[in-house]
Amino acid sequence: MSIYQSIQDFISLALQNGTIEPLDELYHRNQLLHFLGLNDWAEVDKEAHEKDSLILMDQLLAIANENNVIEKGQDEFYEAALMNFITPRPSKINQDFWEKYKTSPDAATQYFYELAQQVNQVKTRDITRNIAFSHLTKYGKLEITINLSKPEKDPKAIAAAKLVKASSYPACQLCLENEGFYGIGNKPARSNHRIIQVSINGEDWGFQYSPYAYFNEHSILLNAKHQPMEINKRAFDNLLGFLDQFPDYMIGSNADLPIVGGSILTHDHYQAGRYEFPMAKAELREEIKLQQFPEVSCGIVNWPMSVLRLSSKNQVELSKAADELLKKWQVYSDESLQIKAKSADGKLHHTITPIARIREGKYELDLVLRDNNTSEIYPDGIFHPHPALHHIKKENIGLIEVMGLAILPARLKTELLEVEKYLLNQENEMSEIHKPWAEELKETEYFSKETVHETVQEAVGEVFEQVLKDAGVFKDNEVGQKGFYEFINFVNN
């Protein structure tokens, strides 16, 4: 197919998406020719030969590279700017989204999600590179992902970033100002990035899909203001308010304290999606009564972390009950279990990771109790993956991991292959950090070429299960569960 046919097919997508009107076609063509380093044209078929936007993207990027128009280390920025040619303006997308919303919330989100994939805002090809498997436990099936989707910066891009003058705009990667931002240095390319303007409880928010999605329709609800994360009654109201508008999605928040929180605490945001996580499938271990809230059902979830599940048709009472539990947890200590609400200097150590959904006509809130205390033995966190597990997972246990989906570092793809060679007594370059674990596996398992890969994955699953147990404040044993019931009594008194 000729380069001009590729360009014409790309323009056809812009027309189809409503990015341009028919009268804009010649103008759009000339802008695109210049962008690709071309100054000529040959007539081609108006009817598209290729309709896959990502194949066309590859073809046009090849043209740009041939014409030397992409500067060293600028591939990511140029690619996003190219896809911006077929991405409708924010006003057009918002108008179409809310028009489709009149049919149903599902129609609106499906429109936006499909468009985000087509214009490569959601990087579907990169996401398919992830390695995924599961691990069956007494709590249900945990999910494990080795995250390969986010490409490593090449040396040229790193060198180019060092030469860029520091900028405070946008203030962070979650600010609304990223929409359409070309990108510079260590600030990612967002030319083709679009955000839906949403009102939640009278506040302005933005709804976008995550470029490197960890689960189906992984989306982010971000505050229009650059302000810190905070778990409080307002947060519970926001989660439940979002469900009123998008009942087919779940939504949750990272905790708002270091160690137990996510990677971005400086910008208020939540994560949502059309996905049932392992924790959502977990049943109640035992139902309990909240004396002050007769309209709210409550129970302890059968999960390695310490989770209370609240359920009610009454959204107001549900939010009040969650707030009461949060306030009680923020002042509760049990030093026999190393649970300590405050430091001597008054610093708070307790918060909650909340997750909301609608199930069988009722609002449901899972409240995961978190404690970010440290000690001499556990300087990274008492309720954080312990050092023996750091060879697999040492990062914070955020919202997604809490719900039973491990996001493991890309290094494990090659490192685990070397572990397999070691277990088969083959020549290997296994990292020393895996040696104690691998030696333990060797003592307990017989390995063959046919079974070693699956057995190592199973062992990784066991590590993730232990990671969640380490993060649990009331351990799943007799002493820990006794402590959990003492906390419930404290809540009710």
UniProtKB/Swiss-Prot annotation:
Pathway(s): Carbohydrate metabolism; galactose metabolism
InterPro entries for the chain: GalP_uridyl_Trfase_II, GalP_uridyl_Trfase_II_CS, GalP_Utransf_C, GalP_Utransf_N
Keywords: Carbohydrate metabolism, Cytoplasm, Galactose metabolism, Nucleotidyltransferase, Transferase
Compartments, as annotated in UniProt: Cytoplasm
Enzyme's top EC category: transferase
GO biological process: one example: galactose metabolic process
Domain of life per record: Bacteria
Catalysed reaction, written as an equation: alpha-D-galactose 1-phosphate + UDP-alpha-D-glucose = alpha-D-glucose 1-phosphate + UDP-alpha-D-galactose
Molecular function (Gene Ontology), one example: UDP-glucose:hexose-1-phosphate uridylyltransferase activity
Enzyme Commission numbers on file: 2.7.7.12
GO annotation, cellular component aspect: cytoplasm
NCBIfam families assigned: galT_2, PRK05270.1-2, PRK05270.2-2, PRK05270.2-3
Family: Belongs to the galactose-1-phosphate uridylyltransferase type 2 family.
Protein name as it appears in the record: Galactose-1-phosphate uridylyltransferase
Taxonomic lineage from the root: Bacteria, Bacillati, Bacillota, Bacilli, Lactobacillales
